[in-house]
Amino acid sequence: MRKNKIFIRVDSGTKVGYGHLIRCLALAEYLQKDWKINFISRSLPGNIIHELEIKKFQVFRLKSNSNRMNQKNDAEKSISLIKKYGGEKNLVIVDNYELSKQWETHVKPYVKKLIVIDDLMNRKHYCDLIIDQNLHTKMNGLYEGL
């Protein structure tokens, strides 16, 4: 049976840290029984992308000339990979503080569901679901308007 695919857009490196990638790796290990997991990640200085490859996940490396991200360009590269290697029922999970509604607006038409992992609540999103693993005392309405 052919598995549906998940594309996880996450970065790691000396400036952005490693927590996002480690969190997504744990999620991918859980989901891989029922889904084909693919990672999309920039090759930033000090990245730990090799941790994904050690676990036998498909990794698509986006070239990065600097630590500054162009969301539209990043979205176009991600869409190209999703169209080339995905199917009809793709799911995208994004865990990246540098990506927001601008990136999501470009990507969403090409996927069945778009899920954002965000715990900052400091930028607008255009997605089907926001996951915040933190416990907040007042969860109701916390993400309204984002």
Task: Provide a role label for each language-model segment.
Residues 32-38:
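A generic structural motif
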Residues 9-18, 23-30, 42-145:
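Active-site and donor-binding regions of nucleotide-sugar-utilizing enzymes
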Residues 2-7:
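Extreme N-terminal starter segment of soluble prokaryotic enzymes
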